[in-house]
Amino acid sequence: LETDGLDFCMERLEHRNPSYGVDFADMHLIDIRAELKNFTIDGPVIHTDIGRLAMRERSGFVVEDLAGCLCIANGCIDIREGHIRTAKSNIELPSLSLIGLDWALYKNFVEEVDITAQVVNTTLSSDDIAYFSPKMKDWHLTLTDVNADVSGPVADMSGSLRSVRTGADTKLSVDFAAQGLPDVGKGHFKADISELTTSAADVDRLA
């Protein structure tokens, strides 16, 4: 199955109308270009192997390339052997699951959608995450060499960052639990740090 220039709209009667980011109650996917294999629909379950998928959402979020084995069902999204590339991020996902009891809970993605992910050799920009978690809009933080396992919703997440780099000199390896994200100022954090190196210039930039 191939598509080129397809538009898709998913609209509910009650819009969330966020000032920034994706409105899951009024989502418009534009110029979808895809190569799909083994595409099946079984009731509420959609399964396919994605060879290539590119699209943009009306919020401004753009996926330049997405590939992997995808399953969607009743508020759950599961990706295996996934790869996602945007202008600022390059994400390798051996596994990713987004689990909501139904699609309506995605309106409150930060608190209501459970995430389980394994990430390897990844570059990740907070500018991309901000489309789904608008409080991160002004962070402008890029993480590189990300190797991690995480679980939980954004607001109550735990995991193991085996490695992550940011700035010119900062490197971190840590097991963590974080509550209250993305509001860092009001959040609560527990960390078992295996390695931390940084510089005064990086600290000033992150402060």
What name fits each language-model region?
Residues 1-207:
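N-terminal targeting/secretion presequences
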